[in-house]
UniProtKB/Swiss-Prot annotation:
EC number: 2.4.2.10
Subunit structure: Homodimer.
Required cofactor names: Mg(2+)
InterPro entries: OPRT, Or_phspho_trans_dom, PRibTrfase_dom, PRTase-like
Superkingdom, natural source: Bacteria
Family: Belongs to the purine/pyrimidine phosphoribosyltransferase family. PyrE subfamily.
Sequence positions that bind orotate: 124
Keyword tags: Glycosyltransferase, Magnesium, Pyrimidine biosynthesis, Transferase
Pathway note: Pyrimidine metabolism; UMP biosynthesis via de novo pathway; UMP from orotate: step 1/2
Phylogenetic classification of the source organism: Bacteria, Bacillati, Bacillota, Bacilli, Bacillales
Pfam families per the UniProt record, alphabetical: Pribosyltran
SUPFAM superfamilies in alphabetical order: PRTase-like
Protein known as: Orotate phosphoribosyltransferase
Length: 202
């Protein structure tokens, strides 16, 4: 599954590699990889594969789940597809509370006392996922863990999830993506070294 998802992400250019002309993330980090999993929404076959893979992952890793929770905004559609497939209630979590109305940070199914799994599109440093986890915990949820489409495999993310004692699982990952890109001739051996060093040194 990890290899198939990595290939799909590369084929539809949801993930692009540029070892010699770095991208700039919104955080200011210079990176040889850019991931925009919102692109998957335009490809029903890829979208369904992600839905089915994450649904199976939730069942296998967490068993009995009460609510599927998406991170705003990119995790919301995938959470909706999964909750429909698993016939579960859904909610989503904003990065911060609204400044008007009821000032809700969480919209949808009530989380208090419920077993919740968070759906994210991408794990980079883990910051947005952990914001969602903490908001759900503050609302009284029992957060079982986080699932996502892809991870860069950054040590910072591992450290942050370990710190809050919440596991995360992804359908594919940076190492798998690099291997698929190598097999398809999209990157050279020198590029691979650049990509690995970037990840290990970040």
């Amino acid at each position: 599954m990890a290899k198939e998802i990595a290939k799909s992400l590369l084929d539809i250019e949801a993930v692009t590699l540029s070892p010699n002309d770095l991208y700039t993330w919104s955080s200011g980090i210079k990176s040889p990889i850019y991931c925009d999993n919102r692109v998957t929404l335009g490809y029903p076959e890829v979208r369904r594969a992600i839905r089915d893979g994450l649904s199976q992952m939730i069942i296998e890793q967490f068993g009995n789940v009460d609510i599927v929770s998406g991170t705003a905004t990119a995790g919301i559609p995938h959470a909706a597809y999964i909750s429909e497939k698993l016939n579960l209630p859904m909610n989503y979590v904003r990065s911060k509370s609204k400044s008007h109305g009821k000032q809700n940070q969480i919209e949808g199914a009530v989380s208090k006392g419920k077993k919740v799994v968070v759906v994210e599109d991408l794990i980079s440093t883990g910051g947005s996922s952990i914001t969602a986890v903490e908001a759900l915990k503050d609302a009284g949820a029992d957060v079982l863990g986080v699932v996502a489409i892809f991870t860069y495999g950054l040590k910072k993310a591992d450290d942050m999830f370990n710190e809050i004692d919440v596991p995360f699982y992804t359908l594919s990952n940076y190492n798998e993506l690099i291997e698929v890109a190598r097999e398809e001739g999209k990157i050279s051996e020198n590029d691979i070294q650049t990509l690995v060093e970037w990840r290990d040194n970040l």
